[in-house]
């Protein structure tokens, strides 16, 4: 691929760039910042050389970069084994990660198919107008053609236009956006001027129009659109779970095992879904197909069943019986909203004794990890995870190395059998909880060798480390680090 004139100039005169191959330029922090500022549309691949998924993506990414060059769209890459600070700055948690920038800002993280055609189509879409002008005559057709939520704003002010366009740029992959300066049209839809109306296809709503009444700022408008797009009472599956998770609202999950049961439960929960639509959402889950999710939600496998899950903290509030009557559900949901319920925490038994490698469970996690007199390194693992098994002998040796240091704890926890408040996106995940800063744990992103893990502890330690003399331990086989979604998403 011929590199564009702009990139060629940067390569020649800026120390921020160097060529990874003839196809896709590799950039460091300085070079990436220059590109973000200069390029109208840019995709950045954050990767690791050892990552199998990254290797599979490489030819597709290179061919897409070649085709998109004529459109003035740049595709570049960042090697996270060389640019660790840069990857941390962008909160890279797995490889490959594809971030998209437009007009100097990150607008999205690409999650579509990692194929040439899909990449090209997605990036060319970024060049299209984000907000479509609309009139009274074209409104109906605009709304009907929308696959999901259709958002229409009414204003004349340029500042309001800039704010609305900023939101639309970030959310345009999921929704369609239009704008009008017609005051009478806004009034006929029940909106103020300026104002925003979201058109929904949710049958559980009383109206197909949701009117925004909040402040005209990007965060508030985005929250309104995000929440409006989530059905009040829908089916939970692989396609819809992400929406519920991204909303930030607690989710009431209704387990059913027959069509008749679902129909009866709809009548019970639909009024509650409408009443509490600003507070939580509700969804049905087929217990015959997805019964294993009940275990993750701390629910007994008796149907029907109901649980409210906080998808941020992953705290679960299961209803204790199968008697899901309107009266019982009204009280239970009301008590949750009023903060009267206590979550049910799943925990393995606390070990009677501990070795050099401390075993954590949910019931002792805070006592050990949040101890402000200790630095604590924690491995979050799954018993079935091959990478975790490969790491085990090295991690045990690491614990032995720091066993004489009373200020350092090396620990592990089975994240599949214990409820934890830490967000885990893959196994193993290793985090360092500093004695003087428990709120901001440091995620380990390096090679899983004894030397690198030990250096990581020493770098971030709150105290002068005291270690036993080390014996050499062979590095575990670092095959492709496969990021795994959280347990519930896997089951779905």
From Swiss-Prot:
Disulfide bridge map: 51-54, 385-388
Known glycosylation sites: 161, 257
Main location, first listed in the record: endoplasmic reticulum
The enzyme's E.C. designation: 5.3.4.1
GO terms of molecular function: protein disulfide isomerase activity; protein-disulfide reductase activity
Site (Contributes to redox potential value): 52-53, 386-387
UniProt record similarity statement: Belongs to the protein disulfide isomerase family.
Name of the molecule in the record: Putative protein disulfide-isomerase C1F5.02
Organism from which the protein derives: Schizosaccharomyces pombe (strain 972 / ATCC 24843)
Lineage: Eukaryota, Fungi, Dikarya, Ascomycota, Taphrinomycotina
């Amino acid at each position: 691929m011929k590199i564009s004139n702009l990139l060629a100039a940067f390569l020649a005169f800026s120390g921020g760039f160097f060529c990874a191959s003839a196809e896709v330029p590799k950039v460091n922090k300085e070079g990436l910042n220059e590109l973000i500022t200069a390029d109208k549309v840019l995709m950045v691949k954050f990767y690791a050389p050892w990552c199998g998924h990254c290797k599979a993506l490489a030819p597709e990414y290179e061919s897409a970069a070649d085709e998109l060059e004529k459109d003035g769209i740049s595709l570049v890459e960042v090697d996270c084994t060389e640019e660790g600070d840069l990857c941390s700055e962008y909160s890279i948690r797995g490889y490959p990660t594809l971030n998209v920038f437009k007009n100097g800002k990150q607008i999205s993280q690409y999650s579509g198919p990692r194929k040439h055609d899909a990449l090209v189509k997605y990036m060319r879409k970024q060049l299209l107008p984000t907000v479509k002008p609309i009139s009274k005559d074209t409104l109906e057709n605009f709304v009907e053609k929308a696959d999901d939520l259709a958002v229409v704003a009414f204003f004349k002010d340029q500042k309001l236009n800039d704010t609305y366009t900023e939101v639309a740029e970030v959310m345009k992959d999921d929704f369609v956006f239009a704008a009008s300066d017609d005051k009478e049209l806004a009034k006929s839809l029940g909106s103020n001027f300026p104002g925003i109306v979201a058109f929904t296809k949710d049958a559980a709503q009383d109206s197909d129009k949701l009117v925004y009444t909040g402040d005209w700022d990007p965060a508030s408008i985005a929250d309104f659109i995000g929440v409006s797009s989530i059905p009040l009472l829908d089916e939970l599956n692989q396609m819809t779970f992400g929406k519920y998770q991204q909303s930030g609202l607690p989710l009431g999950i209704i387990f059913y095992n027959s069509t008749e049961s679902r129909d009866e439960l709809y009548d019970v929960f639909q009024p509650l879904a409408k009443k509490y639509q600003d507070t939580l959402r509700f969804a049905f889950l087929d217990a015959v197909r997805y019964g294993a999710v009940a275990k993750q939600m701390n629910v007994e496998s008796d149907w029907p069943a109901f649980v409210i899950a906080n998808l941020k903290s992953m705290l679960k509030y299961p209803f204790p019986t199968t008697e899901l009557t309107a009266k019982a559900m009204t009280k239970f949901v009301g008590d949750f909203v009023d903060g009267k319920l206590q979550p049910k925490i799943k925990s393995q038994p606390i070990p009677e004794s501990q070795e050099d490698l401390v075993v954590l469970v949910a019931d002792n996690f805070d006592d050990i990890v949040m101890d402000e007199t200790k630095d604590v390194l924690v491995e979050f693992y799954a018993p079935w995870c091959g990478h975790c098994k490969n790491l085990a002998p090295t991690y045990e040796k690491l614990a032995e190395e720091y066993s004489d240091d009373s200020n350092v704890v090396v620990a592990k926890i089975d994240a599949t059998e214990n409820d934890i408040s830490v967000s885990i996106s893959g196994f193993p995940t290793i985090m360092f909880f500093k004695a003087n800063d428990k709120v901001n744990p440091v995620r380990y992103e390096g090679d899983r060798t004894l030397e690198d893990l030990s250096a990581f502890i020493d770098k971030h330690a709150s105290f002068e480390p005291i270690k036993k003399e080390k014996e050499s331990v062979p590095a575990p086989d670092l095959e492709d680090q496969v990021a795994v979604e959280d347990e519930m998403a896997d089951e779905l």
